[in-house]
Amino acid sequence: MAAPPGTHLPTPAARWILLTTVLGSSMALLDSTVVNVALPRIGEDLDAPLTALQWTVNAYLLTLASLILLGGSLGDRFGRRRIFVLGVTWFALASLACGLAPTSGVLIAARALQGVGGALLTPGSLALIQASFHPDDRARAVGIWSGFGGIGAAVGPFLGGWLVEGPGWRWVFLLNVPLALICVPVALRHVPESSDERAHGRFDLSGAALGALALALVTYALVEARQGSLAVALTALAGVAAGVAFVYVEHRAADPMLPPSIFGSRQFTAVNLVTLCVYAAFGGFFFLTALQLQVVAGYSPLAAGTAMLPTTALMLLFSARSGALAERIGPRIPLTLGPLLCAAAMLLMLRVGEDAAYPTDVLPALLVMGAGMVTLVAPLTATVLASVDSGRAGLASGINNAAARAAGLVAVAALPLLTGMDDEAYRSAGAFDAAFRRAMPICAAVLVAGAVLAWSTVRRPVPDCAHPECLRHGNVTAPPLEPPRTGHGAR
């Protein structure tokens, strides 16, 4: 049955929906953030080089970014709750495989399977809220969802550090199993089903395959570029060709996975370009920072995770309010100021070296980063969702998430290459510190580019497109389709 569009806050029905969506999205967020803190220990236990650690992050991002559009479309057509529950179940089973992995190769393969589950559950969590809540309460509902999601992302590094030092890094993945055992029954009992009655036609499997192939080939070429071989160069060219073919197929397909018409909304296009800049910087920053604190500053996994906790307090206090603020003043200022604050935080991280003092070297940067995230998170998602028809909530969520994950994927693959890291860099404090100091200005520059783009192109949403996909709902205010991951490497 169709989801009732009139669920209000605060009611028991609203609380059950929020509990389900927060639990589901938190599985993906926690997994992304806790993994970064565990990377050094994973490398030691599995005798893995830096490229294997990159793939531990990127295998997940690759399948997530490649299939998240398909996941949103599946939810719109077959039922958002049904696909969400399938995604949570798949994610939990893949997490179990990660936790039992005997080698880095098996772990990477299981991480790729995790990304498939993430692609099914991630767009569904926000789409369920969008389809279930009354328009007057959507801003608060998504703000609450974003706030708890941001808290989960911020707590992730602390939790990951505690798990690594306690029961072991494998529990970083096994933790998802009990979360799924809670989430699935609640969803089946208390969350109404919803779908898009306009969804029809054939699935764009060729588009999905070409998109995945393009991302996989380009990522492989970036990770392996240090070899300087002809095979790597040909792989990169093949990836570009697959990307061009993807664009061609999407323009020709009767039912494309990525409908070109949705980009008829200038606002939607602009905010996704900003997303690419922001999440590329976040992806590189959080991947490298988790290693910098442990390899160079000498922090234990628990101490490195605990260092990120100031962002938790800021997200808890202000995330639920930031969506409403953006609704009043428009998204242009928050989407400009937020990236600039985050860029300043990345430059402040240059103070973190050997024997870094937390109060004077680490904390100031993380406080500024938290302020930037709070400023940016809610308006980003609010603007994305306000730029499309609510019936295409799953598609819009998928596109923005795909942009965020693809940006993080490329950043994690490219930054070690751009900064001169080799496979053993994370085992040497001096070598890693030098690369980190080259990487932070690059990430900051990308954020500044995003801020300039936001100031130049983003406006208060107003209808300007005849396509149903491009209708805007100015009363929808919310956060990034996934809050930024404070331990990862992008959302």
Identify the residue ranges that each predicted region occupies:
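Transmembrane-helix bundle of Major Facilitator Superfamily
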Residues: A2-R189, F318, S322, I329-P331, ...
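Hydrophobic transmembrane-helix bundles of small-molecule transporters
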Residues: E165-T275, A281, L288, Y299, ...
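Helical transmembrane-bundle signal
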Residues: L61, S95, A180-C183, L217-Y220, ...
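12-transmembrane solute porter fold
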Residues: R15-V37, L50, S125, A231-T235, ...
